[in-house]
Protein backbone atom coordinates (compact mmCIF):
# COMPACT_ATOMS: atom_id res chain seq x y z
CA UNK A 1 0.00 0.00 0.00
CA UNK A 2 1.04 3.64 -0.35
CA UNK A 3 1.12 4.00 3.45
CA UNK A 4 3.55 1.09 3.76
CA UNK A 5 5.64 2.46 0.91
CA UNK A 6 5.77 5.93 2.53
CA UNK A 7 6.77 4.42 5.88
CA UNK A 8 9.50 2.35 4.21
CA UNK A 9 10.94 5.28 2.24
CA UNK A 10 10.82 7.53 5.32
CA UNK A 11 12.64 4.87 7.32
CA UNK A 12 15.32 4.55 4.62
CA UNK A 13 15.82 8.32 4.41
CA UNK A 14 16.11 8.84 8.14
CA UNK A 15 18.31 5.80 8.67
CA UNK A 16 20.71 6.92 5.91
CA UNK A 17 21.37 10.20 7.70
CA UNK A 18 24.43 9.68 9.94
CA UNK A 19 22.96 11.80 12.74
CA UNK A 20 19.49 11.25 14.16
CA UNK A 21 17.20 14.19 13.75
CA UNK A 22 14.83 15.78 11.31
CA UNK A 23 15.09 16.60 7.67
CA UNK A 24 14.37 20.04 6.30
CA UNK A 25 13.28 20.07 2.70
CA UNK A 26 14.34 23.15 0.79
CA UNK A 27 12.58 24.18 -2.38
CA UNK A 28 15.91 24.37 -4.21
CA UNK A 29 18.69 22.58 -2.29
CA UNK A 30 21.27 23.44 -4.97
CA UNK A 31 21.17 27.00 -3.64
CA UNK A 32 21.96 26.07 -0.04
CA UNK A 33 25.75 25.76 -0.46
CA UNK A 34 26.05 28.97 -2.52
CA UNK A 35 23.86 30.75 0.03
CA UNK A 36 26.20 29.68 2.85
CA UNK A 37 29.13 31.04 0.82
CA UNK A 38 27.45 34.36 0.03
CA UNK A 39 26.23 35.33 3.50
CA UNK A 40 28.46 36.70 6.24
CA UNK A 41 29.80 34.61 9.11
CA UNK A 42 27.07 35.69 11.53
CA UNK A 43 24.28 34.91 9.10
CA UNK A 44 25.87 31.56 8.18
CA UNK A 45 26.11 30.58 11.84
CA UNK A 46 22.52 31.70 12.45
CA UNK A 47 21.34 29.48 9.59
CA UNK A 48 23.48 26.50 10.56
CA UNK A 49 22.75 26.95 14.27
CA UNK A 50 19.15 25.87 13.70
CA UNK A 51 20.40 22.28 13.40
CA UNK A 52 23.36 20.16 14.41
CA UNK A 53 24.16 18.71 10.96
CA UNK A 54 23.09 19.78 7.50
CA UNK A 55 23.08 17.51 4.44
CA UNK A 56 21.96 18.43 0.94
CA UNK A 57 22.42 17.26 -2.62
CA UNK A 58 23.63 19.88 -5.09
CA UNK A 59 22.71 17.86 -8.24
CA UNK A 60 26.20 16.40 -8.39
CA UNK A 61 27.12 15.17 -4.92
CA UNK A 62 26.03 15.15 -1.30
CA UNK A 63 27.28 18.09 0.78
CA UNK A 64 27.48 18.55 4.52
CA UNK A 65 27.82 21.46 6.94
CA UNK A 66 27.82 21.81 10.71
CA UNK A 67 27.53 24.90 12.88
CA UNK A 68 30.62 26.34 14.55
CA UNK A 69 30.86 24.61 17.91
CA UNK A 70 32.96 27.49 19.28
CA UNK A 71 30.21 30.01 18.67
CA UNK A 72 30.31 32.45 21.59
CA UNK A 73 26.52 32.86 21.70
CA UNK A 74 24.91 29.42 21.41
CA UNK A 75 21.21 28.96 21.82
CA UNK A 76 18.16 30.10 19.95
CA UNK A 77 18.73 32.70 17.29
CA UNK A 78 16.14 33.80 14.78
CA UNK A 79 16.99 32.98 11.19
CA UNK A 80 18.36 35.99 9.34
CA UNK A 81 16.26 37.89 6.87
CA UNK A 82 17.93 37.80 3.50
CA UNK A 83 17.40 40.58 1.00
CA UNK A 84 16.97 39.97 -2.71
CA UNK A 85 20.35 41.63 -3.24
CA UNK A 86 21.96 39.12 -0.87
CA UNK A 87 20.31 36.25 -2.70
CA UNK A 88 21.60 37.62 -6.01
CA UNK A 89 25.16 37.38 -4.65
CA UNK A 90 24.78 33.60 -4.59
CA UNK A 91 24.86 33.39 -8.39
CA UNK A 92 28.67 33.25 -8.83
CA UNK A 93 28.90 30.58 -6.13
CA UNK A 94 26.10 28.57 -7.72
CA UNK A 95 27.76 28.73 -11.14
CA UNK A 96 31.10 27.69 -9.62
CA UNK A 97 29.45 24.73 -7.89
CA UNK A 98 27.79 23.70 -11.15
CA UNK A 99 31.11 24.01 -13.01
CA UNK A 100 32.83 21.81 -10.44
CA UNK A 101 30.07 19.20 -10.76
CA UNK A 102 30.02 19.22 -14.56
CA UNK A 103 33.81 18.85 -14.69
CA UNK A 104 33.56 15.23 -13.59
CA UNK A 105 31.10 14.46 -16.40
CA UNK A 106 32.70 16.38 -19.26
CA UNK A 107 36.43 16.59 -18.48
CA UNK A 108 37.39 14.00 -21.11
CA UNK A 109 35.88 16.06 -23.95
CA UNK A 110 37.02 19.54 -22.92
CA UNK A 111 39.87 21.52 -24.51
CA UNK A 112 43.17 20.14 -23.21
CA UNK A 113 44.96 23.48 -23.03
CA UNK A 114 42.70 24.96 -20.32
CA UNK A 115 41.72 24.13 -16.76
CA UNK A 116 38.45 22.17 -17.06
CA UNK A 117 36.59 23.87 -14.21
CA UNK A 118 37.62 27.36 -15.38
CA UNK A 119 36.58 26.61 -18.96
CA UNK A 120 33.19 25.29 -17.85
CA UNK A 121 32.65 28.21 -15.47
CA UNK A 122 33.33 30.69 -18.28
CA UNK A 123 30.71 28.93 -20.46
CA UNK A 124 28.16 28.91 -17.63
CA UNK A 125 28.76 32.63 -17.05
CA UNK A 126 28.16 33.25 -20.77
CA UNK A 127 24.92 31.30 -20.59
CA UNK A 128 23.78 33.12 -17.47
CA UNK A 129 24.62 36.48 -19.06
CA UNK A 130 22.60 35.50 -22.13
CA UNK A 131 19.53 34.86 -19.96
CA UNK A 132 19.79 31.09 -19.53
CA UNK A 133 19.60 30.80 -15.74
CA UNK A 134 17.97 27.45 -15.08
CA UNK A 135 20.31 24.51 -14.46
CA UNK A 136 18.88 22.51 -17.36
CA UNK A 137 19.57 25.44 -19.71
CA UNK A 138 23.08 25.87 -18.36
CA UNK A 139 23.99 22.28 -19.13
CA UNK A 140 22.46 22.41 -22.60
CA UNK A 141 24.49 25.58 -23.30
CA UNK A 142 27.61 23.83 -22.04
CA UNK A 143 27.01 20.91 -24.39
CA UNK A 144 26.65 23.31 -27.30
CA UNK A 145 29.91 25.02 -26.32
CA UNK A 146 31.69 21.67 -26.11
CA UNK A 147 30.50 20.73 -29.60
CA UNK A 148 30.79 24.14 -31.27
CA UNK A 149 33.59 25.77 -29.26
CA UNK A 150 33.74 28.69 -26.86
CA UNK A 151 32.02 31.76 -28.24
CA UNK A 152 29.72 29.73 -30.50
CA UNK A 153 26.86 32.06 -29.60
CA UNK A 154 28.56 34.98 -31.37
CA UNK A 155 28.59 33.18 -34.74
CA UNK A 156 25.68 32.66 -37.14
CA UNK A 157 23.26 30.95 -37.01
CA UNK A 158 23.48 30.77 -33.20
CA UNK A 159 23.74 34.54 -32.78
CA UNK A 160 20.54 35.00 -34.78
CA UNK A 161 18.59 32.72 -32.42
CA UNK A 162 20.17 34.22 -29.33
CA UNK A 163 19.21 37.77 -30.33
CA UNK A 164 15.54 36.89 -30.89
CA UNK A 165 14.21 38.14 -27.57
CA UNK A 166 10.61 37.58 -28.66
CA UNK A 167 11.17 33.87 -27.95
CA UNK A 168 11.58 32.20 -24.56
CA UNK A 169 15.04 31.10 -23.46
CA UNK A 170 14.02 27.45 -23.87
CA UNK A 171 12.84 28.03 -27.43
CA UNK A 172 16.01 29.93 -28.38
CA UNK A 173 18.18 27.19 -26.92
CA UNK A 174 16.22 24.51 -28.77
CA UNK A 175 16.66 26.46 -31.99
CA UNK A 176 20.42 26.65 -31.42
CA UNK A 177 20.54 22.91 -30.76
CA UNK A 178 18.52 22.33 -33.91
CA UNK A 179 20.98 24.42 -35.93
CA UNK A 180 23.82 22.25 -34.64
CA UNK A 181 21.92 19.09 -35.60
CA UNK A 182 21.23 20.50 -39.08
CA UNK A 183 24.96 21.09 -39.54
CA UNK A 184 25.65 17.42 -38.95
CA UNK A 185 22.64 15.98 -40.81
CA UNK A 186 23.21 13.94 -43.92
CA UNK A 187 21.53 15.07 -47.10
Task: Identify the residue ranges that each predicted region occupies.
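A contiguous, surface-oriented mixed alpha/beta subdomain in the mid-to-C-terminal portion of proteins
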Residues: 2-187
Amino acid sequence: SMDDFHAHVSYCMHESVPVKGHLLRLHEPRWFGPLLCAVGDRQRQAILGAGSHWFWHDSHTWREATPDLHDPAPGYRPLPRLSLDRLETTTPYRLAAEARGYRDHYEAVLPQNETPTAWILARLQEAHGAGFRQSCYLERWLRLAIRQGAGFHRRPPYSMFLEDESKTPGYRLSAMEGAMENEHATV
